[in-house]
A protein has these predicted regions:
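Short runs within selected transmembrane alpha-helices of multi-pass transporters and secretion channels
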Residues: 65, 134-152, 160-168, 189-204, ...
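Small-residue-rich hydrophobic transmembrane alpha-helices
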Residues: 44-104, 141-160, 267-331, 362-384, ...
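Short alpha-helical transmembrane segments in multi-pass integral membrane proteins
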Residues: 1-14, 72-139, 181-237, 293-358, ...
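Transmembrane alpha-helix boundary and packing residues in multipass membrane permease domains
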Residues: 17, 21, 33, 70, ...
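Transmembrane helix-bundle signature of multi-pass secondary active exporters and lipid flippases
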Residues: 17-70, 134-141, 230-295, 316-323, ...
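Helix-loop interface residues and adjacent transmembrane-helix termini in multi-pass membrane transporters
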Residues: 26-29, 38-41, 75-78, 153-154, ...
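Juxtamembrane/transmembrane-helix interface segments of polytopic membrane transporters
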Residues: 24, 28, 32, 36, ...
């Protein structure tokens, strides 16, 4: 990370990570595809109604993993073995605690949260059951994201891909078994996902327990070191809050979608799968950006940090533009993976026609946030994100309230990404100039 061609190294680092991110998304995609094809559109709508809640809570856990990634990268770049070990063992405890807390919240309040989102009464029972079962896998997700963060900071993105590939295949097979054979519908796919999450967590932990370098986990060394705890939380909590704040703002979008009929809700659920798929391909370059900048920040190489930002931004924009364009061309075929009813596919295309042009522009926001996190700045970007979400809420109560069309609801994404992207780029530029190496 601190030497060699950045164009080549960032791409080679990102490709396995991209595969890992996409496979993680495929856990939920396989849920939606199986219930859409082998259950009915009611089950599809029920699973789709939980998407933003799942995104909210998994975003918090992913944020913690991102904090671990950057802090470990800082210590590795500075060649601080003791600091690396303390960060790793502290982080494992913090992530496990976070996963348990998220699980408890989901188990206790899923029904109330889904009601606040105006989930259709006919979808409610299956949606609540799906959410509660899926929540049981949250502790495992937290542990996996911890391990992924550590390995990515070390430059190893291949092992997480292998582990998720194994868990992903098992997830799909269990989905088919529980839905087709056991007729469990939404509950079946949630159970399959929870089991797969524990398999991926177990695989990554077995590897970390067997490592021989400074990234090895020893159960006897598990404790909360104050300095490492503070550093990880200062990076992880704001990052998790960024994900959570966006998810909360998106609850207004889901509430707006839920005000339409069940066909529109199901079409939106099918099309929204493209969001997570494309975003996570782009997210691989953001993780690379934070990891490479983090190590070079620890090594004191300012020029290489700036070049990392530019290259990561370029890769992410190209990926978003290509994938968005492909989705515009092959949207109906993509949607047919998750739904069979023509009306549902038509409703999904309304979202795709707008979002396909929008994805690439989100990179200015997200890559700049990752770059700021790489230099240890995570609180101001979170405040900027909060402002962006206020904009989304205002849009919901003004533009959408005026037009009352599904298109006016979807357009808020590109406008909020543009405004936030400008602010995040400006903040990183100012912060970078103040760095002394």
């Amino acid at each position: 990370m601190t030497s060699g061609s950045l164009w080549k190294n960032i791409l080679l680092f990102s490709l396995p990570l991209m595969g890992s991110q996409v496979l993680e998304v495929l856990f939920n995609l396989s849920d939606v595809a199986v219930v859409g094809r082998f259950a009915d559109y009611m089950a599809l709508g029920a699973v789709g109604s939980t998407t933003l809640l799942v995104t909210l809570f998994t975003g918090i856990l992913i944020g913690m993993g991102a904090g671990v990634n950057v802090r470990v990268a800082h210590e590795l770049g500075a060649e601080n073995r003791k600091g690396t070990e303390e960060t790793i063992h502290t982080s494992l405890l913090l992530c496990a605690i976070a996963g348990l807390l998220v699980c408890v919240v989901c188990l206790l309040f899923s029904g109330q949260m889904l009601s606040m989102m105006n989930t259709k009464p006919e979808l409610m029972d299956q949606a609540v059951l799906y959410m509660k079962i899926y929540a049981l896998g949250m502790p495992a997700m937290a542990v996996y994201n911890f391990g992924n963060g550590v390995l990515s900071a070390r430059g190893d993105t291949k092992r997480p891909l292998i582990y998720l590939s194994i868990a992903g295949v098992i997830n799909v097979l269990l989905n088919l078994f529980f839905v087709i054979v056991c007729h469990m519908a939404a509950a079946g796919v949630a159970t399959a996902s929870a089991i797969a999450l524990y398999i991926s967590a177990a695989l990554v932990m077995i590897h970390l327990l067997r490592r021989k370098d400074e990234c090895r986990v020893s159960l006897r060394k598990l404790r909360l070191h104050p300095k490492a705890c503070k550093a990880v939380l200062l990076l992880g909590i704001p990052t998790g809050l960024q994900n959570g704040i966006f998810a909360i703002a998106n609850l207004f979008v889901q509430t707006g979608v839920n005000s339409f009929d069940a066909v529109t809700v199901s079409g939106n659920a099918a099309a929204a799968n493209a969001d997570s798929l494309i975003y996570n391909v782009m997210f691989a370059f953001y993780t690379a950006c934070a990891s490479f900048i983090g190590q070079n920040w620890g090594a004191g190489n300012k020029k290489r940090m700036l070049k990392t930002y530019g290259i990561s931004l370029t890769y992410a924009f190209i990926a978003g533009a290509i994938l968005g364009g492909l989705l515009l061309v092959f949207g109906p075929q993509f949607l047919s993976l998750f739904a069979t009813e023509p009306a549902v596919i038509d409703a999904g295309m309304e979202r795709i026609r707008i979002m396909g042009f929008s994805y690439a522009f989100s990179c200015f926001m997200d890559c700049s946030i990752a770059a700021s996190r790489g230099i240890g700045k995570s609180i101001p970007p979170t405040i900027i994100i909060l402002g962006s979400c206020v904009f989304r809420v205002i849009w919901f109560y003004t533009v959408f309230a005026h037009f009352q069309t599904i298109s006016s609801l979807y357009l808020l994404y590109i406008f909020s990404w543009g405004i936030t992207g400008f602010a995040e780029v400006l903040f990183f530029a100012v912060s970078f100039r103040k760095i002394r190496t």
